[in-house]
Amino acid sequence: MSTGPLIAEIAALVAEPARASMLSALVDGRALTAGELAYAARVTPQTASTHLARLTEAGLLSPMREGRHRYFRLVSPNVVEMLDGIVTVALENRPRRRPLSRQERELSAARICYDHLAGRLAVELTEVFTAQEYLVIADEGAEVTEAGACFFGAFGIDLSALSSARRRFCRVCLDWTERRPHLAGALGAALTKRCFDLAWTERMQHSRAVIVTASGKRGFFRTFGITVSEENWSPTGTDGKSRPSRLAAYPSE
């Protein structure tokens, strides 16, 4: 079976600027109304309706109705991977002509990618997990080691429940801002939820960006050895000392 026509069909849909804007607005996993997506794409409701119908027919969007409103969301994380892949290719080797805007810096630092963390914070977490041999990464796949199972369990993540889920348990995505992998799959989503539950992170209003709270800054350093600052995040503390060699401190509710 030739995949060329399939690629061409999806590429043509995504290539239209309004449809691309609608898809981008849904990358954080939320469901938005047709009106909200029309606003995001800067088109009239009538034009938005036509675009949404085409994206739904192509299997990229899943519609749902709540009362008087009709909501749309991306049909699966695979659509997010496709969009992030396009961005990665578009940015690769492109010379930077201007400094990053504040919004771009916020997204680069930490953001939501469908249902899991992305950006510099997510990449550093993944590097900690591999350095401590909690994860073994090969290509786009990842496997939790015995030590990792103990760690994630102590951190408050039920791995047995994740393993029985219908989605892929553990994998990695290439982060389009950092050009390094970050944790995804059911485990990546559970880790993200745990950080929100601990109030270490908060969603930024009207943005995919994620804010690290004051307790989160303490927690990420104590548990993972990651220093979160306004300027940058580095694998060393502000005093220049290296991160802890063992992640022995676990959070409490």
Segments from the language model and where they lie:
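A contiguous pocket-lining binding segment that forms or flanks enzyme active sites
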Residues: E133, I137-A149
